[in-house]
Regions:
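Active-site-proximal segment of zinc-dependent metalloprotease catalytic domains
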Residues: 1-151
Length: 303
């Protein structure tokens, strides 16, 4: 069920043939998951933390994953751990390399780094599918940032701001958010400016929307709603592009060169050809929108 859910959404659906998928059976002592005490009987030491957080034994998860991939291959492997619970929860753990080679930082490069996405069965198939899209496909595979925020968080912290620009941007991660503490990005300076200038994307609801990475100030996102904000609405164009790029980078290696026009040609199946019935004629350049439900942002570690 999880595998079919992963390939139910573009661009994963169109490029399913480029993926290898393995299932490793792991049986816990007792059924289900609960608070911290459940770590004692869960095969991966999994338990619920605060909000929607899930904590697990990453080292043990990786040891099970190495039954089907090598330790070296883990750098490019997304590991999904599905927990038997109807409770709505999910957390993705991302690792970035401590030593990075600046010579690899070219336009097509997509930084390596293992990922473990923990989430529950969520109680129904549609919620499960959307959770998988956000945690596993968005964070874990495409290295996308969260597009939701909480009003109480205020301005993005200096630590998170510089983590983005020093650690993540050189790896081409978080392509769907634009942190900027001083002023507001314009249609010419925002990270996805080329989509805003492309008339083929005029009906995709793209703009400069305020709020992201859990902060209402200092971070901007490309659409009001998407899988990376509210677990619905599909992946927006910058996110689809990031997914497309990482699929091809992993499938064809460093000799693969990204071509924007080839992406746009593929992406015709996802673009809207006419305005939606609820679209306003004049959308403000900066739009606010707070998250409706508590989420847990990805946990990033430098290894």
């Amino acid at each position: 069920k999880g595998m079919e859910a992963m390939f139910s959404e573009e661009p994963f659906k169109s490029f399913r043939n480029l993926f290898n998928v393995y299932m490793v059976m792991a049986v816990s002592k007792y059924e289900g998951i609960d608070g911290e005490q459940s770590a004692n009987h869960s095969v991966f030491g999994s338990y619920f933390g605060d909000g929607t957080e899930i904590i697990g034994n990453d080292a043990k998860v990786n040891s099970y994953a190495q039954r089907v991939v090598t330790e070296e291959q883990l750098d490019n492997t997304l590991v999904i751990v599905i927990l038997n619970s109807d409770y709505y929860a999910g957390t993705c753990y991302l690792s970035i390399p401590y030593v990075r080679d600046p010579e690899l930082y070219y336009d097509g490069y997509f930084g390596d780094g293992p990922a473990i996405a923990y989430f529950t069965t969520c109680g129904d198939e549609d919620t499960f599918r959307r959770m998988l899209m956000h945690e596993a496909c968005g964070h874990g595979f495409a290295k996308l940032g969260d597009e939701y925020f909480y009003s109480g968080n205020g301005m993005i912290t200096n630590r998170d701001y510089w983590t983005y620009y020093y650690d993540l941007e050189p790896l081409n991660w978080y392509k769907n958010v634009h942190p900027q503490m001083d002023g507001t990005p314009t249609a010419e300076t925002v990270k996805w400016s080329y989509f805003l200038a492309d008339e083929r994307y005029q009906y995709d609801g793209l703009g400069i929307f305020k709020g992201g990475l859990t902060y209402p100030e200092g971070v901007y996102r490309p659409t009001d709603y998407s899988f990376m904000r509210s677990n619905n609405g599909g992946f927006n164009a910058p996110s689809r592009e990031a997914i497309y790029r990482r699929i091809h980078y992993l499938a064809y290696g460093i000799d693969w060169e990204y071509d924007y026009e080839k992406f746009v040609e593929y992406d015709a199946i996802n673009r809207k050809s006419a305005p939606a019935a609820t679209t306003l004629e004049a959308m403000p350049s900066v739009v606010y929108g707070e998250a409706e439900m508590m989420h847990c942002p990805p946990k990033i570690t430098i290894r």
